[in-house]
Amino acid sequence: MKKIFLIISIFIFSVTSFSENVIRKKDLKKVDKIYYLKNSNVPFTGKISEGKDRFYYLDGKQDGKWIEFYKNGNIKSIINWKNGRLDGKYIIYENNGMKSTEATYKEGKENGEYFLYYSNGSYRTKGAYSMGKPIGVWEYYYENGKLTGKGQGI
């Protein structure tokens, strides 16, 4: 019986000793667009956890898929980063769970379809970008879904 207790105690101690440290945004400092743990001169690589929110850094720069939540549990944003710049899908949600903005980025610039939504889910704006420049036909809508106007990108 003592051996079992000893084995269980050692196991519990080893699991808690090697558990992941929780790091929060407030534990980081930003110097010249690079993030470091406070009291460190090494660029931070790792995951930041704040509640359900998840943020990732690689060599001191934002990296990977960041997911942020409202207090009610709904998703607030899904943002993709690469080497400290927006890269990939960029989606912002209203507190009610409806999308408010949807875009795609490449190397920190809008690149691809771009949508703005009203809180009821209907389109506010539809357009497209090519490396940060608006292109093609842009459409603008009333909240009831009726087209209010069109414009031309570059």
Predicted regions and their residues:
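Sec-dependent N-terminal signal peptides
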Residues: 4-13
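Glycine/tyrosine- and acidic-biased, solvent-exposed loop/turn segments at the edges of beta-strands
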Residues: 14-154
